[in-house]
């Protein structure tokens, strides 16, 4: 079987890291010439099945419509109450999996800690006061570890901590993945850094505001969930 993933440029480093054997084409949908190249490729290759998981955009719907068979994710019939990630498994016709949470026992020492306080949903951002408390706690518990804060919002940065400015570019994504690799403990409030950290088998603290269901983690993950 042959697969092709189409994605924005900032997502290609993630595909290359975790699905290195899969063909991936990154493009800017606001660039007409790049869109025409993808359009020409899809007409020539004639794929059998098209999916656009988690996407409701017209561009992704347009591209998968070139396949012999396709179903827009926005039109997928799903139960009114279902796990966010289980929806995609059903959409892609993947087998059901049991959901297991194994509590993580934190190590006695961490030298490098990465904190990602920002979420795509601003209501789920890590509050400033809690961020300050976390930094103080880590400094006491782990004898002044090297703490890095990664965010697009400069107000999240703190004196005494390294700062990493997240940007929507491929280079920034590559640097962010490398930063997670070099960190021993990851703290986040969003599923993006969460899944990257788990895929790289990093110790993780996830602070999640109310969602339904409350815990949405991959099977077999090791972490502590704190609901704000």
Language model features: what each stretch is:
Residues 1-228:
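Catalytic machinery of carbohydrate-active enzymes
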């Amino acid at each position: 079987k042959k697969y092709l993933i189409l994605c924005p440029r900032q997502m290609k480093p993630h595909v290359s890291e975790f699905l290195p054997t899969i063909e991936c084409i990154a493009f800017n949908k606001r660039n007409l010439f790049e869109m025409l190249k993808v359009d020409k490729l899809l007409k020539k290759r004639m794929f059998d099945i098209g999916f656009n998981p988690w996407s409701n955009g017209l561009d992704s719907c347009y591209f998968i419509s070139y396949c012999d068979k396709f179903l827009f994710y926005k039109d997928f019939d799903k139960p009114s109450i279902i796990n966010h990630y289980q929806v995609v498994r059903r959409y892609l016709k993947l087998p059901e999996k049991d959901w297991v949470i194994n509590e993580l026992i934190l190590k006695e020492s961490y030298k490098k800690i990465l904190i990602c306080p920002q979420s795509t949903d601003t209501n789920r951002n890590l509050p400033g006061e809690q961020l300050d408390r976390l930094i103080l706690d880590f400094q006491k518990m782990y004898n002044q570890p090297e703490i890095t804060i990664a965010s697009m919002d400069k107000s999240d940065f703190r004196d005494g901590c390294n700062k990493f400015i997240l940007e929507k570019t491929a280079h920034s994504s590559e640097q962010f993945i490398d930063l997670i690799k070099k960190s021993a403990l990851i703290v986040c409030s969003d599923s993006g850094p969460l899944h990257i950290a788990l895929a790289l088998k990093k110790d993780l603290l996830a602070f999640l505001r109310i969602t339904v269901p409350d815990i949405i983690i991959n099977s077999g993950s090791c972490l502590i969930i704190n609901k704000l």
